[in-house]
């Protein structure tokens, strides 16, 4: 028994047995996690089983696995594939005739990280849709152009929806000095009203803009990042667009809205327009999320300089690195839509 446990999991028999107790020792868990990070498949399988627990330890372990899966935490090459295969095996067990009513598998029947990772591994498209529906529920488009619905949630070219962007950006910026508004369409599809102008009118009239006011704006099936910020008490507006240049009508609508916020002089509205999406199809929402993450981390630095430098550096990445960004950022965004 000692030799078997040690060779499979690099744990002593007491450490292994302790994993199934109510109070798991930090030492045994740390040893197991280290082997998981190194890509040991037996340890990954064991940690995925621990993640099924519906207690603090189960949630902690599930988060560690997802951080490795999404690239937030570094592990061995292909660790994401090893983790999602382990989750898929659990999902298949949870849905067989014997186990399907077993409450121990609850996390594989709700919008959990474990279920999302299992869905990414299944080759069965109908199963992917079934799992996607459990995770997404029923979604409603906020604009006529917005693409939503229960399709392949793991498609590398899927458009991120308003609700998904909202949950991700609100979750990421909690406690930070950024005011992030619910994503909007620039122009109302039936009335033709400039929605950004309307929201700015309301904000200015009520409490005024914060020092860093963020809008994620949909312009005909495309997300752009909009930031109103202050430099020496002057309001500036920054538009970060990671695909083809916006048409002049769209730019005029944005400039008209910016005047309401106080960005009324020549040069107060700055457009950064660089196509970053060659290897990140329909990735405009991903870059909005990334822009917010960067500006949250850089604090008082010039946002124009930060996003220009980021864009230039991104274009220097290899195709493989850009493709990895696409995969990992989608996973990080979707994590905010999961309940455990």
From Swiss-Prot:
InterPro entries: ElaD/SseL-like_N, SseL-like_C
EC main group: hydrolase
Keywords in alphabetical order: Host cytoplasm, Hydrolase, Protease, Secreted, Thiol protease, Virulence
GO cellular component, one term: host cell cytoplasm
Compartment annotation: Secreted; Host cytoplasm
Catalytic center residues: 222, 284
Keyword Heme: no
One annotated GO molecular function: cysteine-type peptidase activity
Family membership noted in the UniProt record: Belongs to the peptidase C79 family.
Stated name of the protein: Deubiquitinase SseL
Taxonomic source organism: Salmonella arizonae (strain ATCC BAA-731 / CDC346-86 / RSK2980)
Taxonomic lineage: Bacteria, Pseudomonadati, Pseudomonadota, Gammaproteobacteria, Enterobacterales
């Amino acid at each position: 028994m000692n030799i078997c446990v040690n060779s499979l999991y690099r744990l002593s028999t007491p450490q292994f047995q302790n994993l199934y107790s109510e109070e798991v020792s930090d030492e045994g868990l740390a040893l197991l996690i280290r082997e998981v990070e190194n890509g040991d498949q037996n340890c990954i399988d064991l940690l995925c089983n621990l993640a099924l627990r519906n207690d603090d330890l189960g949630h902690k372990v599930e988060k560690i696995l997802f951080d490795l899966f999404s690239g937030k935490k570094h592990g061995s090459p292909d660790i994401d594939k090893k983790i999602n295969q382990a989750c898929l095996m659990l999902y298949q067990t949870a849905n067989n005739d014997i186990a399907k009513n077993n409450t121990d598998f609850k996390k594989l029947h709700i919008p959990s990280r474990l279920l999302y990772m299992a869905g990414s591994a299944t080759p069965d498209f109908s199963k992917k849709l079934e799992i996607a529906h459990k995770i997404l529920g029923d979604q409603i488009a906020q604009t006529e152009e917005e693409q939503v619905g229960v399709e392949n949630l793991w498609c590398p070219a899927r458009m991120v929806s308003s609700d998904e962007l909202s949950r991700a950006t609100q979750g990421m910026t909690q406690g930070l000095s950024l005011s992030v508004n619910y994503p909007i369409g620039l122009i109302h599809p039936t009335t033709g009203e400039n929605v950004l102008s309307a929201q700015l009118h309301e904000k200015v009239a009520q409490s005024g803009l914060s020092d860093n006011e963020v809008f994620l704006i949909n312009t005909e099936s495309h997300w752009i990042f909009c930031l109103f910020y202050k430099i020496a008490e002057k309001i500036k507006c920054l538009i970060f667009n990671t695909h083809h240049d916006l048409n002049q009508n769209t730019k005029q609508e944005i400039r008209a809205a910016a005047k309401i916020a106080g960005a009324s002089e020549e040069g107060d509205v700055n457009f950064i327009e660089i196509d970053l999406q060659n290897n990140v199809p329909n990735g405009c929402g991903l870059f909005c999320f990334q822009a917010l993450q960067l500006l949250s981390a850089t604090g008082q630095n010039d946002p124009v300089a930060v996003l220009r430098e980021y864009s230039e550096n991104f274009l220097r990445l290899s195709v493989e690195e850009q493709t990895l960004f696409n995969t990992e950022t989608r996973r990080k965004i979707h994590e905010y839509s999961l309940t455990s």
